[in-house]
Amino acid sequence: DAWRTRGVWANEKAWFQTPYTTFGQSPDGCSTVMFPKIMGGASANEMLLSGRKLTAQEACGKGLVSQVFWPGTFTQEVMVRIKELASCNPVVLEESKALVRCNMKMELEQANERECEVLKKIWGSAQGMDSMLKYLQRKIDEF
């Protein structure tokens, strides 16, 4: 739900990854709609299909994150921004946020339904279960 909040702040050491295909799952969480809107089709495909890991700086450059802060100053930087938001009229903030979201609601609901149908299909197949079990076994072996 990061893209629906007022701001997305990341620690410099954070990384972002959607390894769906690695464990035999299709994208979910409306990522098939939001990722292309946020970072363009090529970058969205790179993340959703190949599971490419982005650094915090790369995520910021692609619009997935709004600001990146050093670990030592992260809390202080975020608190400054939270105080700024807290000083704003809450009705104005909520109504503005609703205006931004209202046009996307139906599109996101439809995307979520499609993604859930695909997940059911994958999870219900022998190949889908096999992929997930192989992924889990690799993780157990790494542990």
Residues covered by each model-derived region:
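Crotonase-fold acyl-CoA enzyme core
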Residues: 1-91
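C-terminal alpha-helix plus adjacent terminal tail
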Residues: 51-57, 72, 76, 80-143
